[in-house]
Design a protein with these regions (language model features):
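Generic marker of residues within folded, mature protein domains
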Residues: 5, 44, 60, 105-107, ...
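Short stretches within intrinsically disordered, low-complexity N-terminal or propeptide regions
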Residues: 15-16, 331
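Bacterial N-terminal signal peptides
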Residues: 5-15
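Primary recognition of N-terminal secretory signal peptides and signal-anchoring hydrophobic helices
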Residues: 16-125, 130-134, 152, 156, ...
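Active-site-proximal helix/loop segments of hydrolytic enzymes
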Residues: 136-341
Length: 341
């Protein structure tokens, strides 16, 4: 099987974003988008209606007035706080969203070898169920996707472990703990969505979640609600998790032609204690009359798994360590890691 690496978003040459003057808005530090743009190599700054546009030779950023919605190089990304009044972005978003996605990361100490896949739900926990007479359970399709993804990741040269490989329910804290104890390099939790109120045809598309930064509310919380300064293990690698989430969402949307429901933040229990880059993917809406049928189709899940492999390969390319002088052509060993007992 051939995998085509999409071009990763072009990173700015500066090693670190420069500060802009901050002011307090609604109890949070904010910086002017225009000032941030000047300080960080964005020669283009324009206001088009209620949209602020920042551009340079390699990047294009869109921010909506009074909204947490942004578009970073063609991918929808939810900010931690809305853009305020005359074009101000929170300092936290400048540091924890723009910096990780636009400025080159330090090379990783080693290549990605082992990936832990977590098929959501299982056993007593069916997850979402759709269909009146012949209900379909989310747990069935997360496992089917995980098994397909494991096969494709093996073919791409990665070791893969699963938190479950049958219809059982590992408790939520157990899932990232398995990844931690096995020294996994990435943790990917697989889920599907459903829309229970209103028109089920009105919502579709994948969402990719990573851990919420300290001091911010999660993407699905009411404005300002849920903000906390508590630190969890996953916050130690939150920049890496955001980069992984971005590359995964980018690959899913582009490969599947799906609606972009954006990169989001959440303090899900399966993410909080992960000691490696960790994301949770909502692969689409089972409740949507068209997308749901695709999710139930093995051929479409195969395409989705291939897109996820592309996302992981793009992240690996972005963070790859320098080539070894003794073995510059080293690659991942192809094997399948068994779940620890």
């Amino acid at each position: 099987m051939r995998f085509f690496l999409p071009l990763t978003f072009l990173l700015l040459a500066a090693p670190w974003p420069l500060p802009a003057c901050a002011e307090s808005i609604n109890g949070h530090d904010y910086v002017s988008l225009a000032g941030w743009a000047r300080a960080n190599g964005f020669g283009g700054y324009a206001v088009k209606g209620e949209v602020f546009v920042l551009t340079n030779k390699t990047a294009r950023l869109l921010f909506n007035k009074d909204s947490a919605d942004s578009v970073i190089n063609g991918v929808n990304v939810r900010l931690s706080f809305p853009v305020a009044k005359g074009g101000f972005i929170s300092q936290l978003d400048a540091d924890k969203t723009l910096r990780p996605l636009l400025f080159a990361p330090k090379p990783a100490a080693k290549r990605i070898s082992t990936i832990c896949l977590d098929p959501g739900h299982g056993g007593k926990d069916t997850g979402y169920r759709v269909g009146r007479f012949f209900p379909r359970s989310e747990k069935t399709y997360t496992l089917a996707l995980a098994l397909e993804l494991r096969q494709q990741l093996n073919q791409a040269g990665f070791n893969v472990m699963l938190t479950r490989d049958k219809d059982i329910y590992p408790e939520l804290p157990v899932r990232p703990d398995l990844a931690n104890r096995c020294g996994a390099d990435l943790f990917v939790s697989l889920h599907f969505n459903a829309f229970s109120t209103g028109d089920p045809a009105s919502v579709q598309g994948p969402e990719t979640y990573c851990i919420t930064p300290v001091g911010a509310a999660s993407s699905n919380d009411a404005e300002g609600a849920g903000a906390t300064h508590a630190v969890c293990a996953a916050n130690r690698v939150e920049d890496k998790s955001l980069r992984l989430a971005y590359q995964m969402q980018r690959a899913l949307v582009r490969s599947l032609g799906a609606t972009d429901r954006s990169v989001r933040r959440a303090r899900f229990e399966v993410l909080r204690s992960a000691q490696m880059p960790a994301i949770l993917i909502e692969g689409g809406y089972m409740s949507h009359p068209v997308e749901g049928k695709k999710i139930f189709d093995a051929g479409y899940r195969k395409q989705m798994a291939a897109a996820m492999v592309r996302g992981i390969l793009a992240y690996q390319k972005l963070t790859a360590p320098p080539p070894s002088k003794t073995n510059p052509a080293s690659t991942n060993k192809v094997s399948s890691a068994k779940k620890p007992k």
